Amino acid sequence: MDLQLQIPSYPIIFSFFIFIFMLIKIWKKQTQTSIFPPGPFKFPIVGNIPQLATGGTLPHHRLRDLAKIYGPIMTIQLGQVKSVVISSPETAKEVLKTQDIQFADRPLLLAGEMVLYNRKDILYGTYGDQWRQMRKICTLELLSAKRIQSFKSVREKEVESFIKTLRSKSGIPVNLTNAVFELTNTIMMITTIGQKCKNQEAVMSVIDRVSEAAAGFSVADVFPSLKFLHYLSGEKTKLQKLHKETDQILEEIISEHKANAKVGAQADNLLDVLLDLQKNGNLQVPLTNDNIKAATLEMFGAGSDTSSKTTDWAMAQMMRKPTTMKKAQEEVRRVFGENGKVEESRIQELKYLKLVVKETLRLHPAVALIPRECREKTKIDGFDIYPKTKILVNPWAIGRDPKVWNEPESFNPERFQDSPIDYKGTNFELIPFGAGKRICPGMTLGITNLELFLANLLYHFDWKFPDGITSENLDMTEAIGGAIKRKLDLELISIPYTSS
């Protein structure tokens, strides 16, 4: 058969040009009539990526600096993705509360699609019936106050073991960052599946890598339609490998859990609850194996970032300010006296420790940027926001805004004395966990762990720096993973305290 060049007919060509003409006309009309938030000059193709990459500055720092120039609501172009950055309590409230439904979605991330079972999870899932059901299960079944309280004995046992290990290493430098990270992950393993995982190090590594992959600044996430770049950058291959590794671990855990389950036994861990709901829950939307895998993976990490990284920051800040450390220690030791241990049921009495936690979360929020996505055309402060626009709320910038906070760079827990401001999503000056429908579901669990860890570290030990480190030269540089973490691990020397 001869190959012949197929030339489109004139009507088709004419229709094509009419179509292009109308698209241009619509685009011009939209740009002429729309009022977009101000923003920096955009380079062709890459947009504002060069400005964010300047000098190796972390994204949330650079966005804060740009917001000082362009205002609390600012447009930036990240490759193909139009984004609006929110940097004040007032505009954050508009997005996270007043227009919560309009901004209830998460931006599409390649990591969420590939690693988290096509967004079958809670944190990155698409807003809709399935997400609402998973969120309800999480709130009422998995992370309710009653459920968290039911795992009190797990926390107490693991913390006791943790303290014994630290005592055995007293007088020598200990990597407190790693020690607390291992503690939080052990607690979450037992809470989620009822036992320590035989390949716990592999699971911890997976959790860390999934968190980093979901940061949202990869080539694939800023050029979502250029599929060839996903491969050329190596990101898609890396995520495929990560998903395969993750799925293999989760499949093994769930299969083993099902095999060992006793008929009629009461659910005593979070995976039991999920499997029971899948079998007997009479749910509006069926709970799939992928839902359970995604939720299990998130439960492993739920509260871990808050607990471990915020403990790290709190200890570092108190080591830099000995008067705060002394005041917090005196309170803990006064409340628990000669008991010899910290009782979780009495932690509510530690009023000053709670101020320390608030101040730590102000300076070091659980997440650097809160991503949302616009679902329908709306306005913020008179500016037009279109569907699919990515919204980035910057809680780090809000927490350090001199218009909101006096001496914002200073660590001063006393600023919260007699203050009604809290971190639970109703005071938009302090939103380390977000707010609204997508507020972090692991907040209560994370805070429970955090307060317990800090109380024990302060009660059982005095602390000093290794040789060469002082409160003046302690490196407080940030790095980005799933949460804002210290660039360098915190190493301290523990000195056992005896109540007598």
From Swiss-Prot:
Catalytic activity: (-)-casbene + reduced [NADPH--hemoprotein reductase] + O2 = 4-hydroxycasbene + oxidized [NADPH--hemoprotein reductase] + H2O + H(+); 8-hydroxycasbene + reduced [NADPH--hemoprotein reductase] + O2 = 4,8-dihydroxycasbene + oxidized [NADPH--hemoprotein reductase] + H2O + H(+); 4,8-dihydroxycasbene + reduced [NADPH--hemoprotein reductase] + O2 = 4,5,8-trihydroxycasbene + oxidized [NADPH--hemoprotein reductase] + H2O + H(+)
Entry's EC annotation: 1.14.14.-
Molecular-function GO terms, alphabetical: heme binding; iron ion binding; monooxygenase activity; oxidoreductase activity, acting on paired donors, with incorporation or reduction of molecular oxygen
Record field: transmembrane: 7-27
Keywords: Heme, Iron, Membrane, Metal-binding, Monooxygenase, Oxidoreductase, Signal-anchor, Transmembrane, Transmembrane helix
Stretches assigned to coiled coil: none
Tree of life domain: Eukaryota
UniProt pathway annotation: Secondary metabolite biosynthesis; terpenoid biosynthesis
Cofactor(s) this protein requires: heme
Positions bound to heme: C440
InterPro entries on file: CYP450_71D, Cyt_P450, Cyt_P450_CS, Cyt_P450_E_grp-I, Cyt_P450_sf
Tissue expression per record: Expressed in mature seeds.
Pfam families xref list: p450
Location relative to the cell: Membrane
Gene3D superfamilies xref list: Cytochrome P450 (1.10.630.10)
Membrane topology classification: Single-pass type II membrane protein
GO biological process: terpenoid biosynthetic process
Amino-acid biosynthesis listed as a keyword: no
Cellular component GO terms, alphabetical: membrane
Keyword Nucleotide-binding: no
Function of the molecule: Involved in the biosynthesis of macrocyclic lathyrane type diterpenoids (also called Euphorbia factors) natural products, including the cyclization route from casbene to jolkinol C, a precursor for ingenol mebutate that is used to treat actinic keratosis, a precancerous skin condition. Catalyzes the hydroxylation of (-)-casbene and 8-hydroxycasbene to produce 4-hydroxycasbene and 4,8-dihydroxycasbene, respectively.
Family recorded in the similarity comment: Belongs to the cytochrome P450 family.
Protein name: Cytochrome P450 726A27
Species, as recorded: Euphorbia lathyris
Gene designation: CYP726A27
